[in-house]
Amino acid sequence: MDRGWSGLTLDSSSLDLLNPNRISHKNHRRFSNPLAMSRIDEEDDQKTRISTNGSEFRFPVSLSGIRDREDEDFSSGVAGDNDREVPGEVDFFSDKKSRVCREDDEGFRVKKEEQDDRTDVNTGLNLRTTGNTKSDESMIDDGESSEMEDKRAKNELVKLQDELKKMTMDNQKLRELLTQVSNSYTSLQMHLVSLMQQQQQQNNKVIEAAEKPEETIVPRQFIDLGPTRAVGEAEDVSNSSSEDRTRSGGSSAAERRSNGKRLGREESPETESNKIQKVNSTTPTTFDQTAEATMRKARVSVRARSEAPMISDGCQWRKYGQKMAKGNPCPRAYYRCTMATGCPVRKQVQRCAEDRSILITTYEGNHNHPLPPAAVAMASTTTAAANMLLSGSMSSHDGMMNPTNLLARAVLPCSTSMATISASAPFPTVTLDLTHSPPPPNGSNPSSSAATNNNHNSLMQRPQQQQQQMTNLPPGMLPHVIGQALYNQSKFSGLQFSGGSPSTAAFSQSHAVADTITALTADPNFTAALAAVISSMINGTNHHDGEGNNKNQ
């Protein structure tokens, strides 16, 4: 079987289908199969050409194993059936270069494609040409909605983070403010504690100053009531009020303000003439009030041996304060009389630092109400002693009055070991020491009770006779007589005037007072009798101390 080469024939009429204007019915016919394969023998290789007049392009193709019969039938059948000229062939598989002979260059036409002016052709790749179904659209919508939700969640997260930062800053500011408030509170508390300590120190200084003995004592003349007395009244009243506040543990703020205003008015600067006019226009009531204000400063201290916390003196007392005194480990208790409303009598009770068995009771003031029989003796004795103490002048500096002094003999004509007048205390104080046993009286014969009816006038007219009668009185009646005599004698000292000229009355009675005092102090039996009476009175009430204390407190 001959080996030849075959060619691939392309019919150009297929290209004419796109351009119907180029179809030529003169030389060509339309075939159903535009691509025709024809076999070309190797002898006809030289005759191979490309026809420029035809519409076909021949491509020489070398085929092996093709039968000659099939080649002949194929070539003859194509040529016979179609009755047309075989177009030029192009051999793409030939080892030799094909020589293209162009016999008629003018008849060769090149196809020129015209551009299509249609613009509705979509040249893009449309992957969804079949249209989106509902499921596809829902998937797209779901994707878009999820993205929006993510964005919203991120925005909310950013907002929450900003709010958290703001809250953190506010919390930090609140912490700083709380720290500042705590520091301020601590500083204020420390300041308050320091102020309280300073106030306590000032109060202690005031108490120590009140208890400390004074170096110098200004003489006081209670008989001569003139402008000088009126000028010094404000100072005396202020000292008394301050001492009362110290004993009672302090008064209210309103009372302090009122006292300050009153003292400011009293101590306001005035001319001397105005002061003299005010003193001259003073009524006897003013003298009585001044005397009572001064009488409150006089104190009578009684020293007695007693195991009870308080001596039963017949009055009812209420404890309103207690404090520790300097130099004495035993506390000092303060009592006021509760038998009548507004009674000015006060007393202080304290154990002796050297001897705990000795109980010191200090009385101050006069009762303004009737007293029971059990309280008359002690009240009369203390009142008379205070009145006699304030009737003279204090000029002693060493704290002990001279036994030859008229005042010491007038108050209580006892020995210096029993009756003591302290001029160095903050206030004039009479101390009655009942801890020593007095000597027995020489004349102890009981006398009749008619001697108790002797009044003060007979005593003043007959001092020697009255002195002898007083020495013969029973011990239970002697304090009443002594107290009445001393109280009546104090009326002539210028403290309690009822009318008339004070200076004239004091001058007229001065000689009688001197005679009475001389008569009382002449006999030593009077001293022993007085001490025995007071001792018996104190010792007689010791067995009632427990009941009296429960009742009084």
From Swiss-Prot:
Induction summary: By salicylic acid, ethylene, jasmonic acid, pathogens, wounding and strongly during leaf senescence.
Region feature (Disordered): 111-152, 221-292, 431-477
Any Pfam family the entry gives: WRKY
Protein keywords: Activator, DNA-binding, Ethylene signaling pathway, Nucleus, Repressor, Transcription, Transcription regulation
Compositionally biased residues, Basic and acidic residues: 111-120, 254-275
Residue ranges for the DNA-binding region feature of this UniProt entry: 306-372
Keyword Transcription regulation: yes
Superkingdom in the source lineage: Eukaryota
Tissue: Roots, leaves, shoots, flowers and siliques.
Biased composition (Low complexity): 122-133, 444-469
Regions of compositional bias (Polar residues) in chain numbering: 276-292
Main location: nucleus
Subcellular location: Nucleus
GO molecular function, one term: DNA-binding transcription factor activity
One GO location term (cellular component): nucleus
GO biological process: cellular response to boron-containing substance deprivation; cellular response to phosphate starvation; ethylene-activated signaling pathway; negative regulation of DNA-templated transcription
Acidic residues bias spans: 138-147
Homology family: Belongs to the WRKY group II-b family.
Functional note: Transcription factor involved in the control of processes related to senescence and pathogen defense. Interacts specifically with the W box (5'-(T)TGAC[CT]-3'), a frequently occurring elicitor-responsive cis-acting element. Activates the transcription of the SIRK gene and represses its own expression and that of the WRKY42 genes. Modulates phosphate homeostasis and Pi translocation by regulating PHO1 expression.
Stated name of the protein: WRKY transcription factor 6
Source taxonomy: Eukaryota, Viridiplantae, Streptophyta, Embryophyta, Tracheophyta
